[in-house]
Amino acid sequence: MAQSVPPGDINTQPSQKIVFNAPYDDKHTYHIKITNAGGRRIGWAIKTTNMRRLSVDPPCGVLDPKEKVLMAVSCDTFNAATEDLNNDRITIEWTNTPDGAAKQFRREWFQGDGMVRRKNLPIEYNL
């Protein structure tokens, strides 16, 4: 059963952090590539620490082995002088899909007893 095998690795480009540059009076969009480097189909989902400022499209999906997806992380306008910019990040969570599951994302894959892996990408704001 897929849930007893730990999910393989993913690769992200960029691999360490996301950087948004001032000015912040316009919406900025940064693209991230996620690659399933493992040998099994995975379901993935993105979480953000600041849903008011950061949005992700698509927020979840399914990747076959070696398959890639390009997603957009958008930063809405904000006042850099009054906002706390220290702890923003996005977190990519992924888990193996059940054997025989259709290639359609299902939130319940993350709610069972299967292993879920996480990768954090801090957000850096250049002022």
UniProtKB/Swiss-Prot annotation:
Subcellular location: Cell projection, Pseudopodium; Cytoplasm, Cytoskeleton
Domain MSP: 9-126
Native organism taxonomy: Eukaryota, Metazoa, Ecdysozoa, Nematoda, Chromadorea
Cross-referenced SUPFAM superfamilies: PapD-like
Organism: Ascaris suum
Keywords: Acetylation, Cell projection, Cytoplasm, Cytoskeleton
Function recorded in the entry: Central component in molecular interactions underlying sperm crawling. Forms an extensive filament system that extends from sperm villipoda, along the leading edge of the pseudopod.
Tissues expressing the protein: Sperm.
Keyword DNA repair: no
Name of the molecule in the record: Major sperm protein isoform alpha
Coiled coil location: none
Subunit structure: Forms filaments 10 nm wide, with a characteristic substructure repeating axially at 9 nm.
Keyword Magnesium in annotation: no
Residue positions where N-acetylalanine is found in the record: A2
A Pfam family matched in the record: Motile_Sperm
